[in-house]
């Protein structure tokens, strides 16, 4: 496919990037922390950590992993916490030790955590105490040998940290009891690491940096193997696209999206480290009044988010009173940005929401609307520099211009493959082209618009939910005979999970089924709607017709609207 989109690039956006500008993320990090040493890198709960402090603490943590725990280059280290100052310290410590970061959603259930730890072969985990009770239930069934435990306030000044830890544990009761007698405290790890020798590993661009887990059409979470080069390439692609709006050493980005999610990891954490910017870490973005109070304290210049976050902010009266004069970048992704939200955003802030599209397997950015656009296009924008895109039919032939086809992408940001899953890798990457599973159309300027999903994936607040996983869990309930899970439109989260169930036990209730699911699934995966049926529609070979149920369920929602 001819790169027609290049003609629509703003004049100061390059058509190609250099993915080999740095040898590794460690090289990028070390150059930035030296260049911006005394400037603030992260702020959380009013506590500022400079680039110099970040360098010192991450070096100490890397030394502890190497010398204190005896871990080697290539070992996997899991990281399970919300946005706290400990996160970047641990993240860059793991990378600087030559190890591979395995990001874990802290809201995972024991079942989900056990799978990810075993699949990745993680030998250590850094976890905040609020979720230690989850780890306790499964740690003995995994290869994890070392548990490094931190508390919410451990990277704050002594007085503030002590107060935060007390309030979190005893007043808010956010730390369920746990028993991990061999755990090492994060503070002790740093204290000991300062006295140990750090040995910078020899890293090459093709070394793995992250195993970033994502669902799959099989419903089993798989680790996308993202190399240092993959991440650096996407970093340069994002920088090339947004760069004209950004000023090195002078940015403050609002990071309400969790850093364990690939969107915030690349666009907030890594990009603004390279640019010498400051990350305002929001630990609990669901507390909108608390988030707005934080925003009022800082002249933020950039904000990233998903549609649900922007919508919640727009509906907050205090947010409407904020000063937006410093803001010059608003980036939306993870799920489609609704037109009404985009229009309200520009009316209030004076800035257009630049919607983009990506997936974990692409580190993540594939396309984004150009920064000079002055309307809400409803599209996912143009492919980013050094990225090829084509639309194909079911036989892998390119479709005619303007016709829908599966979006396929090729570029330096595309993952190596899925960790220890060659068959799944071969299904998604063919001749270097990653098949996204999304059906798109491209207009004459190169703007892409997603029209459907080939996969049955459900997108809840920017998180992928795979029907097979939901169905596997529901089928474990003794009162269920058959189940099908689909996504239906939701005003608050984009989509919500609905299940159609055929009962085995006539006394089965919606309430008991949802309660059962809550024990097995992270909150956003739990079905919000349950409909009991005498039978489910099936194909002539007995396959449940999810699409038929989905169309029917969406029709009901549309009719109600």
From Swiss-Prot:
Its cofactor is Mg(2+). GO terms for cellular component: membrane. Pathway: Lipid metabolism; fatty acid beta-oxidation. It catalyses: a long-chain fatty acid + ATP + CoA = a long-chain fatty acyl-CoA + AMP + diphosphate. It is found in: Membrane. The keyword Magnesium applies. Its EC number is 6.2.1.3. One of its GO terms (biological process) is fatty acid beta-oxidation. It comes from the Bacteria. It is a peripheral membrane protein. GO terms for molecular function: ATP binding; long-chain fatty acid-CoA ligase activity. Keywords: ATP-binding, Fatty acid metabolism, Ligase, Lipid metabolism, Magnesium, Membrane, Nucleotide-binding. Belongs to the ATP-dependent AMP-binding enzyme family. Activity is the highest with fatty acid substrates of > 10 carbon atoms. Catalyzes the esterification, concomitant with transport, of exogenous long-chain fatty acids into metabolically active CoA thioesters for subsequent degradation or incorporation into phospholipids. NCBIfam families: PRK08974.1. This is Long-chain-fatty-acid--CoA ligase. The lineage of its organism: Bacteria, Pseudomonadati, Pseudomonadota, Gammaproteobacteria, Enterobacterales. The gene is fadD.
């Amino acid at each position: 496919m001819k790169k027609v989109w290049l003609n629509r690039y703003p004049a100061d956006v390059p058509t190609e990037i250099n993915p080999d500008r740095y040898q590794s993320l460690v090289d990028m990090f070390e150059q930035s922390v030296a260049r911006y040493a005394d400037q603030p890198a992260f702020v959380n709960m009013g506590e500022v950590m400079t680039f110099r402090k970040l360098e010192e603490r991450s070096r100490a943590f890397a030394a502890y992993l190497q010398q204190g725990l005896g871990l080697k280059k290539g070992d996997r280290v899991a990281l399970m916490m919300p946005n706290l100052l400990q996160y970047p310290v641990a993240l860059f410590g793991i990378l600087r030790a030559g190890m591979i970061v395995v990001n874990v959603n802290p809201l995972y259930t024991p079942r989900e955590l056990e799978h990810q730890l075993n699949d990745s072969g993680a030998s250590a985990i850094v976890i905040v105490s609020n979720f230690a009770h989850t780890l306790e239930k499964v740690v003995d069934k995994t290869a994890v040998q070392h548990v490094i435990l931190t508390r919410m306030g451990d990277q704050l000044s002594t007085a503030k940290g002590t107060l935060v830890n007390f309030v979190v544990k005893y007043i808010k009761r956010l730390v369920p009891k746990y028993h991990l007698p061999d755990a090492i405290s994060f503070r002790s790890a740093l204290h000991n690491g300062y006295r140990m020798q750090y040995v910078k590993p020899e890293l090459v661009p093709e070394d793995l940096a992250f195993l970033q887990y994502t669902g799959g059409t099989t419903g089993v979470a798989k680790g996308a193997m993202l190399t240092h080069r993959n991440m650096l390439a996407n970093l340069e692609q994002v920088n090339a696209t947004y760069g004209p709006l950004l000023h090195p050493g002078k940015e403050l980005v609002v990071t309400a999206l969790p850093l364990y999610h690939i969107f915030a990891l690349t666009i907030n954490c890594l990009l603004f480290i390279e640019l010498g910017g400051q990350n305002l870490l929001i630990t609990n973005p669901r507390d909108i009044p608390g988030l707005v109070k934080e925003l009022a304290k800082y002249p933020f210049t950039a904000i990233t988010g998903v549609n649900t976050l922007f919508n919640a902010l727009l509906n907050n009266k205090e947010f409407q009173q904020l000063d937006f004069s410093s803001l010059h970048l608003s980036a939306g992704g993870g799920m489609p940005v609704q037109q009404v939200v985009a229009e309200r955003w520009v009316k209030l802030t004076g800035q257009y929401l630049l919607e983009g599209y990506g997936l974990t397997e692409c580190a993540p950015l594939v396309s984004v609307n150009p920064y000079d656009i002055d309307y809400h296009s409803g599209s996912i924008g143009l492919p980013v520099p050094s990225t090829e895109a084509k639309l194909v039919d079911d036989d892998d032939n390119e479709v005619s211009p303007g016709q829908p086809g599966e979006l396929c992408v090729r570029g330096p940001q595309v993952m190596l493959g899925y960790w220890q899953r060659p068959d799944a890798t071969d299904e998604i990457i063919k001749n270097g082209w990653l098949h996204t599973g999304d059906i798109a159309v491209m207009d004459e300027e190169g703007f892409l618009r997603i029209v459907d999903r080939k996969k049955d994936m459900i997108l809840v607040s920017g998180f992928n939910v795979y029907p097979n996983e939901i169905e596997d869990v529901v089928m474990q309930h003794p009162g269920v005979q058959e189940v099908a899970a689909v996504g239906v439109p939701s005003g608050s989260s984009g989509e919500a999970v609905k299940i159609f169930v055929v009962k085995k036990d006539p006394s089965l209730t919606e309430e008991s089924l949802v309660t059962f699911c809550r024990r097995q699934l992270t909150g956003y995966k739990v079905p919000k709607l349950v409909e009991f049926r005498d039978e489910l529609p099936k194909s002539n070979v007995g396959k449940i017709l999810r699409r038929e149920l989905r169309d029917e369920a969406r029709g009901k929602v549309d009719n109600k609207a």
